Amino acid sequence: IDPGTLCQGETMATARSNKDYDVIVVGAGPAGLFSAYHLCENSDLRVLVIEKGKAPNKRHCRINDYRECFKCKPCDILSGIGGAGLFSDGKLNYIYKLGKTDLSQFMPVPQAEALIAETEEIFNRFGMDGPVYPTDMERARDVRKKAKRFGIDLLIIRQKHIGSDRLPEHITAMAEHLRNKGVTLHTSEEVKLIRVEDGRAAGVATSRRTYSADHVILAPGRVGADWMGKIAQEFGLGLTQRGIEVGVRVEVHNDILQDLCEVIYDPTFFVQTSKYDDHTRTFCT
């Protein structure tokens, strides 16, 4: 469901019913948070966000204390407000196509670029700003030119690095903003099934109770992919498989990449291998 369509006057007029909420968002990762943000900023719809994990400041992996995985359910690394990326290094890539992600599959490139610019503004609003890379565009272009001589293509991306130590507090600020705008956020509550009436989503049943709503946005994230697949099959929705990218860790001495990474924080080089003709790339440098 496009959250934008829920902000139209006609929808708002009909949304005032005896339902518990106008919109229920399942999952409070990036997709769920941004859906709720768009709705509360552009409408007065009653929005409920349900997240099976915890609040950002309550997410803590016990492996940090005991050096052993306790297989917590739900996992604090993968589940909770902020999604599976809460404890990442907070690297923001402002580009419409990267790896398997290509926004131009869903919209024209100018529209995708406008959406990326809007996304950056929202991140900045909650303090998710940082140094912009490449720090020297001329040097970055020179690196790309040199790489091409060896059959290597460098993708120049506008990047920002937030840092894993700062990301949780910024996501907390975003969640608090949603609450202040009237969005209801439930944590440690798992959606079990979707209620459907007359071919339309009518609400959800959770580990606590049942909620009714005129619209349901499913954004369960990486940890909810299998559940999402089962829901899609249950209601006859089409499913497609995307290719996966398998990575290996290669360590080199800091002196080798330091000069490059001072200009480009996370350089993405593409190489078409000669032996098996595989399309490979570097990431998380």
Language model region names:
Residues D2-G4, G9-G99, E138-T285:
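Residues forming the flavin
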